[in-house]
């Protein structure tokens, strides 16, 4: 089996990564291979040396890519070569010691609570799509799960008796996330009415919770499109991205006194340091409010 095909099987079977994650890895490997072919020829991954790596890094930097994009590409290649060393295809990993300059961390964008209320006013209708969109917003904002996790949510992962969602997270790690009365009510209405109507349009039977207008399972990109359309119905001007509801959930939980480790568990973060970025968000929010309303600054 060729190295890339073997690595793909490893990611899918052993690591059980999502199709989106596997596709991202393979895209990075193929891009590196294409670069080598265009710059001196490519013979075999076993013959890649430090000079090849440095030349590729230089080219990436010249493309004016975001640091996060470069870091992801290097991470993919490092993981690939770790796998090749593990199965004794190569003796050393040429990407093992590659380091990028430290990134300046931008604080996550989030909705203020008043903005959340305005956003929810856009899904007050009773059509099947309104019911779906209401349930979608309630679940995303009320649980903080990732958009990809929401898209993959199935009926057997929803337990109304315990008010818990079983979430299959990154790295094949499962966690239980509670969902409150608003999400429960919205989900019950959608599953009883709206989803039934939408599913009647599809010949395929499946157990995914959220479906598109044709009754087919919704995708992460589909959720992003829905959010974009809902935002256009409001006065909000922020550059919206799907994770803003997740960021808003974490920020508002901390604002209202939630313990940091509790938020970490709910978000499914492997490291507490990942969750701590939201404490900086809340502090920045407090400082902005202070500067805005403190009498000496008015």
Swiss-Prot record:
It is found in: Cytoplasm. The keyword Iron-sulfur does not apply. It comes from the Bacteria. One of its GO terms (cellular component) is cytoplasm. Residues 106-291 form the Tyr recombinase domain. Its main location: cytoplasm. It holds the Pfam family Phage_integrase. GO terms for molecular function: DNA binding; tyrosine-based site-specific recombinase activity. Keywords: Cell cycle, Cell division, Chromosome partition, Cytoplasm, DNA integration, DNA recombination, DNA-binding. SUPFAM superfamilies: DNA breaking-rejoining enzymes (SSF56349). The active site is at residues 146, 170, 243, 246, 269, 278. GO terms for biological process: cell division; chromosome segregation; DNA transposition. InterPro entries: CB, DNA_brk_join_enz, Integrase-like_cat_sf, Integrase_catalytic, Integrase_recombinase_N, Integrase_SAM-like_N, Recomb_XerC, Tyrosine_recombinase_XerC/XerD. Transmembrane segments: none annotated. Residues 1-85 form the Core-binding (CB) domain. Belongs to the 'phage' integrase family. XerC subfamily. Forms a cyclic heterotetrameric complex composed of two molecules of XerC and two molecules of XerD. Site-specific tyrosine recombinase, which acts by catalyzing the cutting and rejoining of the recombining DNA molecules. The XerC-XerD complex is essential to convert dimers of the bacterial chromosome into monomers to permit their segregation at cell division. It also contributes to the segregational stability of plasmids. This is Tyrosine recombinase XerC. It comes from Lacticaseibacillus paracasei (strain ATCC 334 / BCRC 17002 / CCUG 31169 / CIP 107868 / KCTC 3260 / NRRL B-441) (Lactobacillus paracasei).
